[in-house]
Structures are given as structure tokens and as C-alpha cells.
Amino acid sequence: MLTKRQNLIEVMKGGSPDRFVNQYEAFALIMGVPCSPFKQTICGGEPVKDGWGVTKVWPVGTPGAFPLHDDEHLVCKDITRWRDYVKAPRVDYPDLAWEDVVNRTKAINREEQFAIAFLTPGLFETCHNLLGIQNCLINFYQEPERMHELIDYITDYQMAVAEQICD
């Protein structure tokens, strides 16, 4: 019988897996990476500001946290001036901050699973968190060049995060 990792590799290369892949079973998700912009919100708790400056709240009776996009909390109020509003979170953390993550990563059986840093949000989510979903979608149509610049900026940040994780 193949390991979870081997089975997924067989699926990816069009080989001969010995069973259906069960979603994320081949991945050991590593949470709590120091340079992650994500900040945990608690159902019914106080609003929390993430590394991008986005304030999120998780009201009781809802399926999860979502950004506050009122005038007080919206990070990027004008896509044509996004550089004035949007500041990427820091990525440079000392080795000591990585110690727990390194130890948890070393404990993963790499024959059985892939080690994967769990980072959220992604590109689109970051855009709509910063702009509000309505403004984000409108700006894709009305200001595609500015949206492309913002996406490049977010991508550069995510690449810097990836470099930190791989180091």
C-alpha cells in the first residue's frame, strides 16, 4: 500500500494510485508561521486587525469571520491611490520566532506527508479584504491597471513570505 504522499504523487503524474486521495491527507499543514498576516478571530469576540490592516469580526450565528468594510475600517478607499493605503506586513522575523515552526516541521514524517505552510488569505481574498468585495469587482473592470499593480504588490509580498519559509 502506498503512503499518503506516494498515492498523491501517483495521481499527479497520472500513475497508478491504490486508492482515492482523501483531500488533504497527503499534507501536514503547518499553522502559525511567524510571517503570516492572518490573525485568529474568535466567534463572538472582539474585532481583530490582521497584518494588512484589515479588521475582521466573527459575529455569533455566522459561519466565519469577515472583514469590516465600513468607512472607518476599509483599508483601501481609492484604488487609484492604493499605494497611500496598502502596506504589506513585515516578513523579517528572527530565528527565535521560527523555532516552534521548525520543530513542528522536523516532526513530520516526510515519507508519509508533504510539509505545507498554511497561509491565508490568497490573492483574490486579500484584494477584496482591502477594497471591499463590491469595490474590488468594480475595480477589476474600471481600473484593471491599478488592480494589476496591487496584485503584483501582494504577489511580491507572498513571494517574500515563501522565501522566509523555505529558508
Question: Which positions does each model-derived feature cover?
Answer:
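Catalytic cores of TIM-barrel enzymes
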Residues: M1-D167
